[in-house]
Regions:
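Conserved mixed alpha/beta catalytic, RNA-binding, or beta-rich assembly cores of soluble enzyme
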Residues: 1-316
Length: 316
């Protein structure tokens, strides 16, 4: 038997805890998911990161990134190497991810202090819908526990932006940063500045594109796109502004290759349009079309970490 608690009920039972954000993003086409957690403290986030990585389950990678704990996983169920923390077992882990309509069910295991994390901390985060507990649930001490945490099904949307400035005024990275911060739809995840080919003849100065990513409900994507388009339209100083839109957790390899090559190769707009069409990227002309190369490249480079911000010579 189980019992169910809402976040406010968990908070009332255990007192206020530390989880500031908890998002479950899914990419059902590729059978993968990503769990993003914002924690108030560096210590518990780092401990959870290494233990979840060691415990395996459905996790394929766990890392700290941009102040967030990011967990890549496969949709389904996996075997846990779970127990007191030591070389071959971890004290906290994710056993299963299931998509149930508009919700995602994640099954967590924790022991001792880690049971508090999965039983009291995450479940009281406002991003959680409800948590299901077994009747014999106990946390802390030496207790081992498991729970099912149910959250809204979210998807990742990347919005690339280029050519919003002139030699007199403007900065594309500022436009996209403001757009992400002020967007009322979804949750802002990351902001990137993507270095393009410094030898591009039509550059402003540094020749950079930019992009932001969001966690959003699928039915809210049209509203997100509408907000981004109109925000950029009001903020741009250029007649050649383009935004691009990509949904998913896996940027296609051909799109990544194009993005990287834009750091050293000079392309025509039609090249970028073709790559976009072949790889599921929506291109939106805001005030023109010359910005399409950078806006497509920004999506391609989005998951490259520091490499997105540099030129190839920086990494030789």
């Amino acid at each position: 038997m189980t019992y169910v608690l809402r976040p406010d009920e968990v908070r009332e039972k255990y007192g206020p805890m530390f989880c500031k954000g908890f998002y479950t993003l899914v990419d059902e086409e590729n059978g993968v998911a990503q769990i993003i957690e914002r924690c108030s403290g560096q210590g518990p986030a780092e401990w959870d990161t290494v233990n979840r990585r060691r415990t395996k389950g459905v996790a394929t990678d766990v890392r700290m990134k941009s102040g967030m704990m990011v967990m890549d996983a496969v949709i389904g169920e996996g075997d846990l190497r779970f127990g007191p923390a030591q070389a071959d077992t971890g004290g906290q882990g994710l056993k299963a991810i299931k998509v149930e309509g508009s919700e995602v069910r994640t099954t967590w295991y924790g022991i001792a202090g880690a049971s508090v994390g999965i039983g009291a901390c995450i479940p009281q985060c406002p991003d959680v819908i409800r948590t299901e507990y077994p009747d014999d649930f106990k946390i802390g001490g030496a207790h081992s526990a498991h729970v099912d945490i149910i959250t809204p099904k979210l998807v990742r949307v990347i919005i690339g932006v280029d050519d919003t400035d002139t030699k007199e005024k403007g900065a594309s990275w500022v436009t996209s940063m403001k757009m992400g911060a002020q967007c009322p739809v979804g949750k802002l995840l990351e902001h990137k500045i993507v270095q393009l080919n410094p030898k591009a003849p039509n550059k402003t100065t540094n020749c950079c594109a930019t992009a932001v990513s969001f966690a959003v409900k699928e039915e809210e994507i049209p509203a997100l796109i509408e907000f981004a388009t109109e925000f950029v339209r009001k903020e741009t100083y250029s007649d050649d502004t383009v935004i691009t839109v990509f949904k998913g957790l896996k940027v296609p390899e051909a799109l990544r290759e194009f993005g990287w090559s834009c750091k050293s190769v000079l392309y025509k707009p039609e090249d970028a349009i073709r790559i976009a069409e072949e790889n599921g990227v929506q291109v939106i002309s805001v005030t023109g079309m010359k910005g399409v190369i950078g806006a497509v490249a920004a999506v391609g480079c989005f998951d490259m970490g520091e490499a997105a911000a540099g030129v190839p010579e920086d990494f030789e």
